[in-house]
Amino acid sequence: LQASADKNGPETAARDYALQDDSKLTLPTPQAAIYQAAPNPDMNLYWGELHLHTSESFDATLFGNSIGIEDAYRFAKGEPLSSAGGEVMQLSRPLDFVAITDHAEGFGTRTHCGDPNLSLGERAACWLANEPNPMIFKILTKGVRGTATPGDLSKPAGVYQRTTRQSPKPGSFPTCKFGDGALERCLKNAINDWARYIHLADKYYEPGVLTTLIGYEYSPGMPEQGKHHRNVIFRTNSVPERALSSLDVPNAIELWKGLEATCGKDCDFLTMPHNPNKAWGLTYSRFTWDGQQYGEDDWRLRQRREPLTEIFQIKGAQ
């Protein structure tokens, strides 16, 4: 039977393929899947970035980032952008929202560096601040981080030793040390820099296309490259005149109190800590990094102002 079937069965030769007319086949008409969810704006999914640095942040400069604030906004809207190395980058889809959160500690510290009348010391300080180099990194880790205290391994995890530490001062940055009135110049420029961030966020805000949130990073230093940083995000463009940094307030409790005191009408904000994996147990400790202990009012203040924690960024999962 098998031999008979092989002998008398149909054959399909390669030459017959060209004779086939697929247009004669009956194919179903593709139908787009239609799903209409019930209106619920609180459950819509949006994609964005709440931790973004530009060339205005010194650590970004160290990594060779030469992209400015306006370029960052255009990139968030989906425009292509060329990196310092010539690579063309573009998002697969534009973002729905973005907050540029450059380090507030750097506001005003490099604004004057384009002045041709700077002294030799001022020019040297500006070179250190603008050119990625190991020397300035060492200066910052020693000077701007304040006075360190030795760790106490006998203490339970998450409980920092209550030893007084000296918080760094506004004049710690090299560019704010040299020249007559250098510190006052940096403080004035810091206010002007912050005003520029507010202006550009408003400029690139496009309802229904891109929501630009005004923000910055609060970045106190810790020993051994520890991180205890927070991004400060404002709800509207009604924001304080100054961006409070770790040069103004020494810890998170004082940050929240300071922001509440300087926020005017229609001003609202939240903070988000990041890198809790490098905070040496302090992110959820009952002590601040400089030894201040949380009271009941402090916990309620944190509950009101810090409902979120960042869990992923360019450094990886935390």
List each model region and its residues.
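Extended, charged catalytic domains and RNA/DNA-binding interfaces, predominantly
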Residues: 4-318
